[in-house]
Amino acid sequence: MSEQLLKCREFVLKEKMISLTDKGEIFNANNELIGTFRGKLIKIGNTYRIRDLNETPVLTVAEKIISLRSSYRFYKGGEKDDSQYLGILKRKLVAIKPSYWFEDPNENHVFGMKGNIFTLKFKILKEGNVVAEISKKLWKSILRGHYGVKMNPDLDDDSAMLILGIVLMLHHEKEENR
C-alpha cells in the first residue's frame, strides 16, 4: 500500500482544521487518499510522521528544540534512529524573507527553496533545477490548509518523500509564524 504513496509525484495535502495535533491527509491528483501525516499533542519539539494507508510510517521528521534557527531532522521510517537519518532542513538565521535548505548527513546542500513561505507558493530546487512546486493555485484551492505539490516525475522515491516532508515542515513554519 505504501507503493501508492512512494510512487506518487502529484499530491494534495489537506490539513484537518479542528485538531489538537497537526494532522491531515495526503491525496493523489485523482483525489484518492494515499496517506496521512500527524504531529504530537504537545507542540514543543514536535515529531511528525508521514504514514501510508496501513499506518506504516514512511518518514519521520523531528523538530530540533535547542537551536538558534528552525531546523528539522528527517529519518526514513518511523523511528528517530541515527542509522535511518536522511538529513536536516534548516532556516537562514537572519533574513527579511525566510530562506530554507535541506542538507544530507554529510552536510551537502541537496535542496533549496525559493518563493514565499507565507502564501505557501514556492519551488524546491536541486542543483539549480526545479524539482517540485508548491501552491494553493495548482489545485484551485481557496480552503485554508489545502495545497498542491507537483514534483518532477523523474524524482526517485526517497527524494519525493523528503520533499513531501519538507513541504509539511514549511507549512508548520508558516503556521508557527502567524
Question: Predicted segments — roles?
Answer:
Residues 1-178:
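Intrinsically disordered, low-complexity proline/glycine-rich segments
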